[in-house]
């Protein structure tokens, strides 16, 4: 049995201690926000926050998390959307949506650790977006950082010309 806190609730998993956190969350706790993408630490779709830091839940066994504090996308905020979620919507980041939860969790952890991240910190995020939403992701990070520093987000979409990055065809790769 492994005990931890998940989204503020005490949880005991009666599973093999070598069970990846991703499967404990999805199958035993019915928290399906963390996505299965690769099972090889390559995509970041399974990102959750463990003790304040972003962790790929496919790559960590529950046995190593005894007493840990886990936050999933379902527990990122209560009531109102988290500033990263608000910025994600305001910048219209989502395309296919598969990477959304992992990206949002990684960005929330990044902004908690580094309230005004530079391009190098943003580029170092391990998450991959295959849709090529990189420019919108960067704008969402900047918007969320500003909101977290100054208060509630504006929810209306500002009118602005499209950048050359947005009008270019999608590129293969991480989209960061």
Per-region residue spans from a language model:
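Signature of N-terminal electron-transfer/Fe-S-associated modules in redox systems
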Residues: 1-176
